[in-house]
Swiss-Prot record:
GO terms for cellular component: apoplast. InterPro entries: ConA-like_dom_sf, L-lectin, Legume_lectin_dom, Leguminous_Lectin. Residues 1-23 form the signal peptide. It is found in: Secreted, Extracellular space, Apoplast. The lineage of its organism: Eukaryota, Viridiplantae, Streptophyta, Embryophyta, Tracheophyta. This is Lectin-like protein At1g53070. Keywords: Apoplast, Glycoprotein, Lectin, Phosphoprotein, Secreted, Signal. Belongs to the leguminous lectin family. GO terms for molecular function: carbohydrate binding. Glycans are attached at N33, N84, N134.
C-alpha cells in the first residue's frame, strides 16, 4: 500500500487583510495492509481476493455472505471544508471502482462517494438507501449529506430513473440530478455518448469536482485504463456551502439487495 498525505497551511498577506487557507491532500494507490487511515462501518472491509483468503487490494463495501449487506469506509481524519461558516473550499476527488454481480439477475444496489458530518454509520440502511440514509431521515435538511451515487437498481419509490445511472444526492437518496451512466468522446462529427454498464464488473474511474467560485459540481466517469474524458457526465449548479459543515468526513458507502453483488474501491485521491 502506498499512501501520500499532505496537510499544509498557506498564509496570504495583503496590505489591509489576511486570509488563511488550509488544504488537505491524500492518495491511496491500493488498500489492505492494515495501517490505512480508513475506518470500516457495517459490513465494509478490505476486499477478499478470488481465493477467499488473501486480500484483493481494494475496499469492499459489502460482503458476499451477508444478505442485504451494506457498509461505509471513511477516511479517519476530519477534513476542513470551510475557512468560515459561509465560504467553502473547492475540492476534487478521483477513484477507481467496480460493481460485480455474483448472482443473476442483478439485484443491486450500488455505491456512492460521500461527504458526511461523522465517522459512523448509524443513519445508513441497505437496499436503495445505499448505506447513506434510511426511510426515516431521508430528505431531512439536517443530514448535511453530499453524495454522488453509482446506482444499479431502479427503485421507483426513491425516484430512480433506471438501473444504471449516476446521481448527485443532497440530504436525500432522491437525487437532485441523475443521468444515464456513460461518458462523452469527441469525434469528427461532434460529441458522441458511450454507455457504461456500472454493474459489468469492469473497473471504472470517477472524477468529482466542486468549483466554489461558480458553485458547480461536475462528475465524470470513464474506463479506468483511459484518460479522463474532456466533457463531464454531469455539470450542475449547487451551493454546497449550505450543506457541508466547516469540518466533515469523506469516504464511500454501498449496499446490495437480495442477490449478491460486490462493491469495491481500488484507489482514491482527494484534494481541497
Amino acid at each position: 500500500m502506498k499512501i501520500q498525505i499532505l496537510c499544509f497551511t498557506t498564509l496570504f498577506l495583503a496590505i489591509f487583510t489576511s486570509q488563511v487557507t488550509t488544504a488537505y491532500k491524500f492518495k491511496f494507490d491500493y488498500f489492505g495492509n492494515g495501517t490505512d487511515p480508513i475506518s470500516f462501518h457495517g459490513d465494509a472491509e478490505y476486499g477478499p481476493d478470488t481465493d477467499g483468503k488473501s486480500r484483493s487490494g481494494a475496499i469492499a463495501l459489502t460482503r458476499d455472505n451477508i444478505p442485504f449487506s451494506h457498509g461505509r469506509a471513511i477516511f479517519t481524519t476530519p477534513i476542513t471544508f470551510k475557512p468560515n461558516a459561509s465560504a467553502l473550499y473547492p475540492f476534487k476527488t478521483s477513484f477507481t471502482f467496480s460493481i460485480t454481480p455474483k448472482t443473476n439477475p442483478n439485484q443491486g444496489h450500488g455505491l456512492a462517494f460521500i461527504v458526511v458530518p461523522s465517522n459512523q454509520n448509524d443513519a445508513g440502511s441497505g437496499l436503495g438507501y445505499l448505506s447513506l440514509l434510511n426511510r426515516t431521515n431521508n430528505g431531512n435538511p439536517n443530514n448535511h449529506l453530499f453524495a454522488v451515487e453509482f446506482d444499479v437498481f431502479q427503485d421507483k419509490s426513491l425516484g430512480d430513473m433506471n438501473d444504471n445511472h449516476v446521481g448527485i444526492d443532497i440530504n436525500s437518496v432522491d437525487s437532485v440530478v441523475s443521468v444515464k451512466s456513460g461518458y462523452w468522446v469527441m469525434t469528427r462529427s461532434g460529441w458522441l455518448f458511450k454507455d457504461l454498464k456500472l454493474s459489468s464488473g469492469d473497473r471504472y474511474k470517477a472524477w468529482i469536482e466542486y468549483n466554489n467560485n461558480y458553485k458547480v459540481v461536475s462528475v465524470t466517469i470513464g474506463l479506468a485504463h483511459l484518460k479522463k474524458p474532456n466533457r463531464p457526465l454531469i455539470e450542475a449548479k449547487f451551493d454546497l456551502s449550505k450543506v457541508i459543515h466547516e469540518v466533515m468526513y469523506t469516504g464511500f458507502a454501498g449496499s446490495m439487495g437480495r442477490g449478491v453483488e460486490r462493491h469495491e474501491i481500488w484507489d482514491w485521491t482527494f484534494q481541497n
